[in-house]
C-alpha cells in the first residue's frame, strides 16, 4: 500500500469511525449534476470539523513530548482554535489561544458568540493581538512566556497546518477512496483551501489512491499566486515524510473569496441557504459556503474536467453562523 508509512506517526484516536459520505439528491437536481458530500462537519467533539483529523496527530505528538499546554492562533471565530481548545479540555490540558480580529468589526455577535463563546466554555486562556502578521514567530514568543510561567507548552500552527497535522487528511484520503468504491465515475473533489493542510494532505493521498480524480481547492483568503506555493510546500513536506513522490499539479480557484477572509459574500451566503433549505446541511460563511459557491458556479461555467459526480469535502464551521448573524 503506497501510504503504509502513515503508521509510523503516533495518532490519538479522537474520531473513532469514518465520517459519512452521502449523496445529496435535492442539491444534485439543482445544477443537474451528481453531488456527494464528505461529512467532516460531524466529527464527534465540540460541534465537529476537519481540524480534529489534524489534532489526532498533533496532540499525540504533544503528549509524547510531555506537554501540559496547547498553544495555537487564529481569528476570533476560528474553528481550529475551538476544536483545539475542546481537545485540550477533554484531555485535561491547558489551552492558550492567540486571537486576531481579521475583519475589524465591533459587532457583538462576532466578538462574543459562535466559536468565541465556546472558547470560554472550554476555559481557554485568551490572548489578543492586533494582527497575526507572523503567526509562527508570534506563537513562539507566546510559548516562551507561557513556559516561563511553569507550563510545558506545545505550539500548534494556525489551522493545524504542518506536515504532521496534514497527515490527518492523507488518512482521510484512505477513507474517501474506500467509501467512493460505489460512486461510479467520480470526477472531482472540491475543498476549501485556507491554511492549506487539508488541501495538501488530500493532494498527496488522492494522487496515490485515486489518481484520475481532479482535486480543486477553492481559496478563502488568498489569490492563486499566493496560495499555490503554500499548498505545494506542504504537499512536498508531507510526501517527504511518507517517502513518496508528489507530482500532482495543485488546482486552485480564487474567484469566490472576495472581499476577503472572514467577510461573507452574496454567493457564499446563497450557498449556505441553498444547502440548508435543500438538504438540511449547515455550511458556514467563511469556508464551506464560499467553497460550495465555487462548486455550483464551476458546474454552470463548465470548469470541471468532465461531467462525472463531484465530492464536496464539508470541513465544518457551523458555529460561525451565530457569530455572523444578522448577515445569515
Swiss-Prot record:
Cofactor(s) needed: pyridoxal 5'-phosphate
The enzyme's E.C. designation: 4.4.1.15
Enzymatic reactions: D-cysteine + H2O = hydrogen sulfide + pyruvate + NH4(+) + H(+)
Record carries keyword Glycoprotein: no
Keyword check for Membrane: no
Pfam families for this protein: PALP
Domain of life: Bacteria
Modified-residue entries (N6-(pyridoxal phosphate)lysine), positions: 51
Disulfide bridge positions per record: none
InterPro entries listed in its UniProt record: ACCD_DCysDesulf, D-Cys_desShydrase, D_Cys_desulphydr_bac, TrpB-like_PALP, TrpB-like_PALP_sf
GO terms (BP aspect): D-amino acid metabolic process
UniProt keywords, alphabetically: Lyase, Pyridoxal phosphate
Recorded GO MF terms: D-cysteine desulfhydrase activity
Annotated coiled-coil segments of the chain: none
Protein family per UniProt: Belongs to the ACC deaminase/D-cysteine desulfhydrase family.
Known partners and oligomeric status: Homodimer.
Function according to Swiss-Prot or TrEMBL: Catalyzes the alpha,beta-elimination reaction of D-cysteine and of several D-cysteine derivatives. It could be a defense mechanism against D-cysteine.
Protein name: D-cysteine desulfhydrase
Record organism: Salmonella paratyphi A (strain AKU_12601)
Origin organism lineage: Bacteria, Pseudomonadati, Pseudomonadota, Gammaproteobacteria, Enterobacterales
Gene: dcyD
Amino acid at each position: 500500500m503506497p501510504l503504509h508509512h502513515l503508521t509510523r506517526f503516533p495518532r490519538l484516536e479522537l474520531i473513532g469511525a469514518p465520517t459519512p459520505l452521502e449523496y445529496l439528491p435535492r442539491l444534485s437536481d439543482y445544477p443537474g449534476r451528481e453531488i456527494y458530500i464528505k461529512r467532516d462537519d460531524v466529527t464527534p467533539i465540540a460541534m465537529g470539523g476537519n481540524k480534529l483529523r489534524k489534532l489526532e496527530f498533533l496532540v499525540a505528538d504533544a503528549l509524547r513530548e510531555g506537554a501540559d499546554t496547547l498553544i495555537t492562533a487564529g481569528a476570533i471565530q476560528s474553528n481550529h482554535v475551538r476544536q483545539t481548545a475542546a481537545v485540550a479540555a477533554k484531555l485535561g490540558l491547558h489551552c492558550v489561544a492567540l486571537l486576531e480580529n481579521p475583519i475589524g468589526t465591533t459587532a457583538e455577535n462576532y466578538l462574543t458568540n459562535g466559536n468565541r463563546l465556546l472558547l470560554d466554555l472550554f476555559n481557554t486562556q485568551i490572548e489578543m493581538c492586533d494582527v497575526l502578521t507572523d503567526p509562527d514567530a508570534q506563537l513562539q514568543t507566546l510559548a516562551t512566556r507561557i513556559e516561563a510561567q511553569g507550563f510545558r507548552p506545545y505550539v500548534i500552527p494556525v489551522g493545524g497546518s504542518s506536515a504532521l497535522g496534514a497527515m490527518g487528511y492523507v488518512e482521510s484520503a484512505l477513507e474517501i477512496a474506500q467509501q467512493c468504491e460505489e460512486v461510479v465515475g467520480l470526477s472531482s473533489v472540491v475543498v476549501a483551501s485556507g491554511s492549506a493542510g487539508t488541501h495538501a494532505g488530500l493532494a498527496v493521498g488522492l494522487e496515490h489512491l485515486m489518481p484520475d480524480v481532479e482535486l480543486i481547492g477553492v481559496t478563502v483568503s488568498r489569490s492563486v499566486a499566493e496560495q499555490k506555493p503554500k499548498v505545494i510546500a506542504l504537499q512536498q513536506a508531507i510526501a517527504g515524510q511518507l517517502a513518496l513522490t508528489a507530482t500532482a499539479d495543485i488546482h486552485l480557484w480564487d474567484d469566490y473569496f472576495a472581499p476577503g477572509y472572514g467577510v461573507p459574500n452574496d454567493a457564499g451566503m446563497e450557498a449556505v441557504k441553498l444547502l440548508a433549505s435543500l438538504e438540511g446541511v449547515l455550511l458556514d460563511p467563511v469556508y464551506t459556503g464560499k467553497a460550495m459557491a465555487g462548486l455550483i458556479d464551476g458546474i454552470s461555467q463548465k470548469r470541471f474536467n468532465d461531467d462525472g459526480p463531484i465530492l464536496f469535502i464539508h470541513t465544518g464551521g457551523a458555529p460561525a453562523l451565530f457569530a455572523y448573524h444578522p448577515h445569515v
